[in-house]
UniProtKB/Swiss-Prot annotation:
PgiMA1 automethylates at Asp-421, Asp-434, Asp-447, Asp-460, Asp-473, Asp-486, Asp-499, Asp-512, Asp-525 and Asp-538 before being processed, probably by the M64 family peptidase found in the genes surrounding PgiMA1, to release methylated peptides which then undergos macrocyclization with the N-terminus of the modified core peptides. Peptide backbone alpha-N-methylations change the physicochemical properties of amide bonds to provide structural constraints and other favorable characteristics including biological membrane permeability to peptides. It comes from the Eukaryota. The lineage of its organism: Eukaryota, Fungi, Dikarya, Basidiomycota, Agaricomycotina. It comes from Phlebiopsis gigantea (strain 11061_1 CR5-6) (White-rot fungus). This is Methyltransferase/ribosomally synthesized type II borosin cyclic peptide precursor pgiMA1. Residues 251-377 are annotated as: Clasp domain.
Amino acid sequence: MSSASSDSNTGSLTIAGSGIASVRHMTLETLAHVQEADIVFYVVADPVTEAYIKKNARGPCKDLEVLFDKDKVRYDTYVQMAETMLNAVREGQKVLGIFYGHPGVFVSPSRRALSIARKEGYQAKMLPGISSEDYMFADLEFDPAVHGCCAYEATQLLLREVSLDTAMSNIIWQVGGVGVSKIDFENSKVKLLVDRLEKDFGPDHHVVHYIGAVLPQSATVQDVLKISDLRKEEIVAQFNSCSTLYVPPLTHANKFSGNMVKQLFGQDVTEVSSALCPTPKWAAGSHLGDVVEYGPREKAAVDALVEHTVPADYRVLGGSLAFQQFMIDLALRPAIQANYKENPRALVDATKGLTTVEQAALLLRQPGAVFGVMKLRASEVANEQGHPVAPASLDHVAFTAPSPASLDHVAFSAPNPASLDHVAFIAPTPASLDHVAFSAPTPASLDHVSFGTPTSASLDHVAFEAPVPASLDHVAFAAPVPASLDHVAFAAPTPASLDHVAFAAPTPASLDHVAFAVPVPASLDHIAFSVPTPASLDHVAFAVPVPDHVAGIPCM
């Protein structure tokens, strides 16, 4: 037992599940952690998974099952498993613990280790895995949402004397280990569970004894039995630590409230119940969740299929191949996730093939920005690669206080939306913003670019490429103007409507030029620098002809 100062806690703990069906159930996320962990501890259900872990791990792998002993209470073993993982975390290692199935379902050491690690100041998290319940849903093909579903551990069910709801599905785990506290499972107390089931469902109700197949050579067990059959020794002998019982609802208990159906749907109870809650049918060897194949409602739905058209708001996959691969790698690789969290700018800059819009979306680090790039309406897809175009109706880009701290540029790639009329940053403008760039053609309706107080400290340029919008009438920087700003540039032709460029106190010390290309706008009436005028300003350049009404450069 140990604790450490959070200042020096470089270790971490990740708990993951390997699933039930050998390697087939291991998620890509878990595999990525296996490949990047410093050390892997595991308790798995088969040797193939063990071999796969060892093949893919970069560091040592240790089997926690060695801590089990026939004469040891399981709880003590679980405490020791947790402590073994924690000791490696305390040594500063990136630790991965893998448990078969889902690591949070009937896994005591995983929860204990996570709780203690967090209390000691270490990073700790759990990754999901495929549980035997998930496996059961697929093999038995019943939907837990149709009738509702309750799940119990067999011993806990008996200890708590819980009343089983006969109107819904019930799942009972570990029926082969009723009342067992050590590693050796024996099933002498199954009869107590049978007594309980007969009390609630009667002796003739059908249940399913289920064991999901593990190895490719294994066969799934899904034996349909009467509850009274569970008293037979030859049946009970087939139960083991992996045995689960599925208890379907009683048919007669599956009824809707006619009054509530009317209130919710305004329809007859018979019509609604057939659509939302079909009666379960039971027969040995058949699938357990039979459906209404082609009743009147189903036939009408099938007939309507040929007339279906793609909805206007349906979105297709978009984004460049580079953006798609970036997001796939980000989802799968823990190391990339950490780098993205620490320094998104560096990671984005190092990724080739991203458009400026995609770069901006990644730097915002918001789910909405990613969906905006990757899920597009047909009208937004510009080419076969799915590169998006800016919507024609966009009239402004606005960042409210506080603007995202990591934003370093706002970039519009060709074509920019024709209706864009302003780009506005409300206080505080992000400290990392270094440029606002419009590529050809800049929107014709753009009339101002404004930065609220304080303007970003790192901003070094505002650039408009040809043609600059004819409607632009001002570029305004509120106090304080960023110290790193070194130029404001307008490419030919400079907008005819521009009437001022204004810098509020203090003007940036690094500003070295304000440049206007031919022709200089006829409407320009002033360039204003507030006190103090920047010491580094080396020119204000006007190409021929200069507007007659521009008398000079006022210095305030």
